A protein has these predicted regions:
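Charge-rich, low-complexity amphipathic helices
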Residues: 37-42, 73, 104, 108-111, ...
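Metal-dependent nucleotidyltransferase catalytic core
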Residues: 1-99
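Generic preference for well-ordered secondary structure
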Residues: 2, 11, 34, 49, ...
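Conserved nucleotidyltransferase catalytic core and NTase-mimicking acidic/glycine-rich helix/loop elements
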Residues: 127-222
Length: 222
């Protein structure tokens, strides 16, 4: 029973501290934290992600700290920082802000920022020019052609470079199709959802690190 409040108390104490700071304009829960009901006695959570808008401060500052086993990941943004992130169509920012949970909002700006973020997110990233797309294709093509002669490399090095270039190819797929590039740890998960056929080709590469299989992925995309 003692666990009831433990997480809620820690959460409440830290969020209250942030809200009561005179410099704070708005506080949001983002990531998986936004769907959690912290008042439940058996709530399970390891980390709490928070966005804070401030009057004065750096454009963006990230502070990580641990309190009673719970990790807080707090991103502070100044007014200028928020404007800049929106005008740069910064993926991580609009993705989180589009459905952030509002905990505090001194100047009633949340609905506007959330609307703008949602629109940017749905429109997708800035479109690349044909020149840029063609450069990506050539650049990656040149990299992987180095791997043609397997015997030139140590086994470990060959595997390492194959994985490295495979990642470049996958990012290239998102770029040339004018899609948002997911974070590294979400790259394969999103790819599987977007294009299962391509995902299957990608997962075959690591079965035997065959050059032809890497080339198949490249040719499928480009």
């Amino acid at each position: 029973q003692k666990m009831i409040g433990c997480i809620y108390e820690v959460y409440n104490e830290e969020i209250t501290k942030i809200i009561e700071n005179q410099n704070t304009l708005a506080v949001y829960l983002v990531g998986s934290s936004k769907d959690v009901d912290f008042t439940l006695y058996d709530v399970e959570i390891n980390d709490i992600d928070v966005f804070v808008f401030v009057k004065e401060g750096e454009k963006q500052e990230r502070i990580l700290f641990k309190k009673k086993g719970i990790e807080f990941d707090v991103n502070y943004f100044s007014k200028d920082g928020v404007k800049k992130l929106l005008s740069n169509r910064e993926y991580f920012f609009v993705k989180e802000m589009k459905d952030a949970k509002v905990l505090f909002d001194r100047e009633n700006i949340s609905h506007i920022i959330k609307d703008i973020s949602r629109n940017i997110y749905l429109e997708g990233p800035s479109k690349m020019s044909l020149e840029e797309k063609s450069f990506i294709k050539q650049d990656i093509g040149a990299k992987i052609s180095n791997l043609k002669n397997k015997e030139k490399f140590d086994v470990f090095e060959y595997h390492f470079l194959t994985n490295l270039y495979l990642k470049d190819i996958i990012i290239g797929y998102f770029n040339i199709n004018d899609k948002w590039v997911p974070k590294d740890k979400k790259l394969l998960k999103v790819l599987k959802k977007e294009n299962n056929e391509l995902f299957e080709l990608v997962s075959k590469v690591s079965e035997n690190y065959d050059y032809q299989r890497l080339l198949d992925v490249y040719n499928y995309i480009f």
